[in-house]
Amino acid sequence: MSPGLCFLKEISVIQATPKPTTRSFANCCKMGILQHLMHILDIPGFPWKIVIAGFSIGKYAWDLYLRRRQVPYLLREKPPAILAEHVDEKKYQKALSYARDKSWFSTIVSTFTLAVDLLIIKYDGLSYLWNITKFPWMDKLAASSSRFSLSTSITHSCVFMFGLTLFSRLIQIPFNLYSTFVIEEKYGFNKSTLKIFVIDLLKELSLGGLLMSVVVGVFVKILTKFGDNFIMYAWGAYIVFGLILQTIAPSLIMPLFYKFTPLENGSLRTQIEELAASINFPLKKLYVIDASRRSTHSNAFFYGLPWNKGIVLFDTLVKNHTEPELIAILGHELGHWYMSHNLINTIIDYGMSLFHLFLFAAFIRNNSLYTSFNFITEKPVIVGLLLFSDALGPLSSILTFASNKVSRLCEYQADAFAKQLGYAKDLGDGLIRIHDDNLSPLEFDSLYTSYYHSHPILVDRLNAIDYTTLKKNN
């Protein structure tokens, strides 16, 4: 039956019902659209391999194009006029050299990654990995009883995903080592050791494997149990898992990598507590973490449930900034909370995840997609999700512009909030110092910024808070 006839049949059933509900009509529309999408996308013999390989090559070419546009900005001799008196020219040239090194290294890594991806596509790497991770006992157990069939499917999917993740991490190790112990070391950022590097890698693989097993297991179970009606159940699971992860990450996961120490009593702690109290921020915990064990880069963030918040400061941030600068930076961070930016971003994320699940529903039964990648007899849902993600590449790239635009708007608003609190000059000083300490470039191509940057560039942020005027007046 064609999608159109199926849709008409569903309409006739609803019309025959004495009291049709809004929900049933919505479901009808949803299923009609899904059936239509399934029909359009599932074309026998459609060259999905060529299409997805083309998307990968296109993404690679796009990244190269943007990096090429940025090159002239990395060859400039002097900093922007607004920063001329704040930035040492030797430090400025060092920052540009650091950016150039990272840019060419990123090109090498992305070239290697593209080559691996194309080889996996050409030689049916996913199908091969699926077959070798299917141990004989799985088939025997599934055949012995129907109640074991779902369990073996979940186990197989988890083993497959762990194998894929392990492969991806292992082939990236040489690049990670070079980035950490050559590039970061060259510019004075690296404080890590080979021992710390290996321990962190093992922790990441172990923790990642555990979390991934939970996510994959729940996802496969939902799709197996609810079939084509999985969307809302999977979306609900995504929301619940995200909330749990946000809650436990600072207290259970991050302490595996960093030592959390309560900020000692003193002037800084008192000022932070007074700032939090002035805007009714429910501050319960205030920590400093030993980020300097791995790097000299700095950061700060807040976390927690709406009624129980904590603030985390990198020790590098505390060490390198004056107290007024630290308070101004935290004024910016708390501005995100005050204006509900996290909530807004969460709602956007949940909305996009629902949209992606709706699109995925049109791919999940796509025979031509699975067949193109040599999945003839089996159509694992976890593989379908991976292939769907690859097919969604161009849309994801387009959405990156929108998400970064929203993020930059939030950053401007948080800066304005700190300015309203009277911290504009100190915030400007702090931002300049952060960029100086992190050897961040000061000028960027506009298209490059639109695609890659979730934060406005420094010059634009300083202009937005009238930093130059405030500096002259002081």
Curated annotation (Swiss-Prot):
Top class in the EC scheme: hydrolase
Highest taxon listed in the record's lineage: Eukaryota
Coiled coil: none
Membrane topology per record: Multi-pass membrane protein
Keywords, alphabetical: Endoplasmic reticulum, Hydrolase, Membrane, Metal-binding, Metalloprotease, Protease, Transmembrane, Transmembrane helix, Zinc
Transmembrane annotation, as ranges: 103-123, 196-216, 230-250, 344-364, 381-401
Subcellular location per the Swiss-Prot or TrEMBL entry: Endoplasmic reticulum membrane
Reactions listed under catalytic activity: Hydrolyzes the peptide bond -P2-(S-farnesyl or geranylgeranyl)C-P1'-P2'-P3'-COOH where P1' and P2' are amino acids with aliphatic side chains and P3' is any C-terminal residue
Record-linked PROSITE patterns: ZINC_PROTEASE
Cofactor binding note: Binds 1 zinc ion per subunit.
Signal peptide annotation: none
Active site: E333, D415 (proton donor)
Cofactors: Zn(2+)
Pfam name, any one: Peptidase_M48
UniProt binding sites for Zn(2+): H332, H336, E411
Principal location: endoplasmic reticulum
UniProt-listed Enzyme Commission number(s): 3.4.24.84
UniProt-listed InterPro entries: CAXX_Prtase_1, Peptidase_M48, Peptidase_M48_N
One BP term from GO: CAAX-box protein processing
One of the record's GO cellular component terms: endoplasmic reticulum membrane
Keyword check for Transmembrane helix: yes
GO molecular function: metal ion binding; metalloendopeptidase activity
Sequence similarity: Belongs to the peptidase M48A family.
Function of the molecule: Proteolytically removes the C-terminal three residues of farnesylated proteins.
Protein name: Probable CAAX prenyl protease 1
Organism name: Schizosaccharomyces pombe (strain 972 / ATCC 24843) (Fission yeast)
